[in-house]
Design a protein with these regions (language model features):
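Structural motif corresponding to the early beta-alpha repeats
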Residues: 48, 64-84, 109
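Structured C-terminal cap/extension of enzyme domains
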Residues: 25, 32-35, 39-40, 59, ...
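Short, electropositive alpha-helical surface patch
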Residues: 58-71, 125, 158-164, 255-261
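Glycine/proline-rich, positively charged
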Residues: 18-19, 32, 36, 81-200, ...
Length: 369
């Protein structure tokens, strides 16, 4: 962990795209800017962009910079392994895809009650600790999406876990379902450094309702993202706050306030609390656009995009939402009403959303004709 230079990391789940492919030239520019400004932590996973994230990092980062210049985190994704014997070949394929001979951090991906049992059955933790002993992994940790009691159980079962990545932002801090604060407190009790994901909640804390945006604008300070990321970074024990940046503009904004980080002051914390109150009064879908739900959807429904359109209509009363629903994000056989209720999406959703019911709500809103 001593290699980490600053507490802000480049999350590589939302890289800039040109059509279906990663925008390699812009990603190279972003990697260069990130390293030049003194930051060096990169986070990926095989499932990010259907494997293209790992390959992009090889082309934009690992083939262009010495290994000691960056910290690279990858994850063991349970959907790619069926048994213990699958783990090492999968791990070696990740090393090859990323163009490295070791990972600084290797996380058991998206741990929850269901996933955790699968990892135990496959002896995934034991294999990861063995990889560390062999020098192929420097630190073993988990990324986590569930209730605090489940996290407590995992850290009790495997005290050798070194770091925990949790969803943490000011909107989820006291949320009953996500339990960010309670999960953070479990990490602190166990003495585990915390890696923060979703500090802007998939963009929800950037694209604010108009009245919430007005509260932050009155501070005459930074961008909406700056308050969200600084909120997360300001807690003790936060080793890293990740941001899934998809443009140079986003990166430059983030680096401007994280290069010489300062926690939120009292006025800023009060403003953030007001924003939370505004959100609580709105009936928004708490989707973070991770897109885990779309890979296995037999109807190819663009679930996160439909939820985003629904939120946009409720938040901004935007008539354009109907256009985007009809002409951009749906097609024959892939509208919300085409859901066959198989439940595949709900089994992989880190937010545990009732997606089938929500799609019915979307259909009711946009398919009135």
């Amino acid at each position: 962990m001593e290699k980490i230079r600053k507490n802000f990391g480049f999350g590589c789940m939302r890289l800039p795209m040109i059509g279906e492919d990663v925008d390699i030239e812009q990603t190279k520019q972003m990697v260069d800017c990130f390293l030049e400004q003194g930051f060096n932590y990169f986070d990926t996973a095989h499932g990010y962009l259907q494997g293209k994230s790992e390959l992009a990092l090889k082309e934009c980062l690992t083939s262009r910079y010495p290994r000691e210049d960056y910290v690279l985190t990858n994850k063991l994704s349970g959907s790619y392994i069926k048994k213990e014997e699958d783990i090492r070949p999968f791990f070696e394929s990740q090393l090859a895809a990323c163009g490295v001979d070791y990972f600084d951090f290797y996380l058991m991906h998206s741990q929850s009650t269901t996933n955790y049992q699968h990892y135990r059955d496959c002896r995934a933790y034991e294999t990861a600790f063995a990889l560390k002993a062999e020098g192929k992994v420097r630190h073993v940790g988990i990324s986590f999406h569930d209730r605090a009691a489940v996290l407590e159980q995992i850290l009790t079962d495997y005290p050798a876990i070194e770091v925990v990545q949790i969803q943490f932002n000011y909107l989820d801090y006291d949320d009953v379902a996500v339990q960010s604060r309670k999960c953070y407190e479990v990490c602190r009790r166990h003495g585990k450094p915390v890696l923060v994901m979703e500090p802007v909640k998939g963009g929800s804390l950037v694209n604010l309702p108009d009245d919430a945006k007005a509260v932050l604008d009155a501070l005459h300070g930074g961008s909406p993202a700056s308050y969200a990321i600084r909120f997360a970074a300001g807690f003790p024990g936060m080793l890293m706050v990740l941001s899934g940046m998809s443009s140079m503009e986003q990166m430059q904004d983030n680096l401007s306030y994280m290069k010489d980080f300062t926690p939120l002051n009292n006025a800023e914390r009060t403003a953030v609390s007001k924003v939370v109150e505004i959100f609580r009064k709105q009936d928004l879908i708490p989707c973070t656009s991770c897109r885990y739900c779309t890979d296995g959807c037999p109807k190819h429904i663009s679930i996160p995009d439909l939820f985003a359109i629904m939120n946009t209509k409720h938040t901004h009363h935007d008539w354009n939402a109907d256009y985007y629903y009809e002409d951009v994000h749906t097609g024959p056989g892939s509208r919300a009403s085409d859901c066959i209720r198989c439940g595949q999406c709900e089994r992989v959703c880190p937010q545990h959303l009732p997606i089938r019911q929500l799609l019915q709500d979307v259909a009711k809103e946009f398919e009135k004709g």
